[in-house]
């Protein structure tokens, strides 16, 4: 099982993304990831193993690297996510649950 959380805002949304994804932690224990998007700097993505620690502990130290007004986070028991996809429509961060 797994869970995901996404947000789009007119203001910076990294804190909402972090806490919203952390709230899904009870749905999986293997991998966690977040991706944020800023029109100035593009995508920033990070994926961590959660088998021996908590989501919050893994991501808190690099939270200042995430910038943007939109983002997606995932807790997964199967795959390392979010995936960055390039296609003729543009670049996307995608998760599957």
Regions found by a protein language model. Give the residues of each.
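N-terminal glutamine amidotransferase
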Residues: 1-97
């Amino acid at each position: 099982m797994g869970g995901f959380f996404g947000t789009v805002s007119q203001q910076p949304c990294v804190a909402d993304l972090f806490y919203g994804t952390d709230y899904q932690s009870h749905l999986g224990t293997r991998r966690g990831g977040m991706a944020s998007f800023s029109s100035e700097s593009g995508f920033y993505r990070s994926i961590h193993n959660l088998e021996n620690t908590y989501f919050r502990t893994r991501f808190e130290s690099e939270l200042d690297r995430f910038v943007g007004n939109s983002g997606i986070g995932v807790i997964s028991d199967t795959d390392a996510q979010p995936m960055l996809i390039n296609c003729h429509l543009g670049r996307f961060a995608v998760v599957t649950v």
